[in-house]
Swiss-Prot record:
Protein name: Cytosolic Fe-S cluster assembly factor CFD1
InterPro entries for the chain: Mrp-like_CS (IPR000808), Mrp/NBP35_ATP-bd (IPR019591), NUBP2/Cfd1_eukaryotes (IPR028600), P-loop_NTPase (IPR027417), YlxH/NBP35 (IPR033756)
Residues that hold ATP according to the record: 30-37
Origin species: Candida glabrata (strain ATCC 2001 / BCRC 20586 / JCM 3761 / NBRC 0622 / NRRL Y-65 / CBS 138)
Pfam families for this protein: ParA
UniProt keywords, alphabetically: 4Fe-4S, ATP-binding, Cytoplasm, Iron, Iron-sulfur, Metal-binding, Nucleotide-binding
Function text: Component of the cytosolic iron-sulfur (Fe/S) protein assembly (CIA) machinery. Required for maturation of extramitochondrial Fe-S proteins. The NBP35-CFD1 heterotetramer forms a Fe-S scaffold complex, mediating the de novo assembly of an Fe-S cluster and its transfer to target apoproteins. Required for biogenesis and export of both ribosomal subunits, which may reflect a role in assembly of the Fe/S clusters in RLI1, a protein which performs rRNA processing and ribosome export.
Organism placement in taxonomy: Eukaryota, Fungi, Dikarya, Ascomycota, Saccharomycotina
Domain of life the protein comes from: Eukaryota
Length: 285
């Protein structure tokens, strides 16, 4: 169904509560191309591997990539009597994992979304109020880069739900950290707690000897965290094997969660999630 038709057809549906969701985490970046959606995907897979029930909401309306990341791009969302039903990801007995994205409502991957602010706001409001998530331990919200209509809308929609906070993603280069500063300032303006900064693409893991080489500069994310007095969650290298996993997951034996648990990045994300849980457990100031 065309997403604009979907907006019209669900108008007037009663809002759904997020009260059954224990923790809400937003994943933000000031700059495009820093691997934010990759971080969201791996965070979800890690939490699921830890046994948690996880939902992922993709509000990058003009560039929804999560359906492909999870290997469910051919799925379609349908509306039940209770609201929109998230698309499940097979976990084979691990925690529950499900995804909602505008990508499921588009006719094809090449369909462009050319919407002004009010229509984006309406779509995000529907995602927040009309999706039947059920009981979840975590809801991850993947946002577009920058501080645009989507960010303002999600901040407004979540203002009464008391989200745990935001994970801010950057790469080591100065051009990325400069834009992330704006994202941190945005979080502070809307009273969204920053759980920490992740430095993504911090080095390259050789697929043959597993040695990690710094192909970019290093330490930009940690310096940024110190500058703004926010937690530094860790650095994540580029691993070609993870790219291969995402691209060829349907040809491999096992679920995406099981395959990811064998990757070199899984232990790194386990440590990062422990830090996130520690930060989110602290009382908000």
């Amino acid at each position: 169904m065309d997403p604009e038709e979907q907006l019209e057809s669900t108008e007037g549906v009663p809002a759904k509560s997020l009260s059954l969701i224990k923790h809400i985490l937003l994943v933000l970046s000031g700059k495009g191309g820093v691997g934010k959606s990759s971080v969201t995907t791996q965070t979800a897979l890690t939490l699921c591997g830890m046994g948690y029930n996880v939902g992922v909401l993709d509000i990058d309306l003009t560039g929804p990539s999560l359906p492909r990341m999870f290997g469910i791009e051919d799925s379609s969302i349908y509306q039940s009597a209770d609201g929109w039903m998230p698309i499940p990801v097979e976990t084979n007995g691990k925690g529950k994992l499900c995804v909602v994205s505008l990508g499921f409502l588009l006719g094809s991957r090449g369909t462009s979304v050319v919407w002004r602010g009010p229509k984006k706001t309406s779509m995000i409001r529907q995602f927040i109020k009309d999706v039947t998530w059920g009981e979840l331990d975590y809801l991850l919200i993947d946002t577009p880069p920058g501080t645009s209509d989507e960010h303002i809308s999600i901040a407004e929609e979540l203002r009464f739900t008391n989200p745990d906070g935001a994970i801010v993603v950057t790469t080591p280069q100065g051009v990325a950290t400069a834009d992330v500063k704006k994202e941190i300032n945005f979080c502070r303006k809307v009273n969204l707690r920053i759980l920490g900064v992740i430095e993504n693409m911090s080095g390259f893991v050789c697929p043959y000897c597993t040695e990690c080489t710094n192909i970019f500069s290093k330490g930009g994310g940690e310096s940024l965290a110190k500058q703004f007095d926010v937690p530094y969650l860790g650095n994540i290298p580029i691993d070609p094997k993870f790219v291969d996993l995402i691209e060829n997951q349907k040809k491999m034996e096992g679920t995406l969660v099981e395959l990811y648990e064998k990757s070199s990045l899984y232990p790194i994300y386990l440590e990062i999630m422990k830090k996130v849980q520690e930060e989110s457990s602290k009382p908000q100031e």
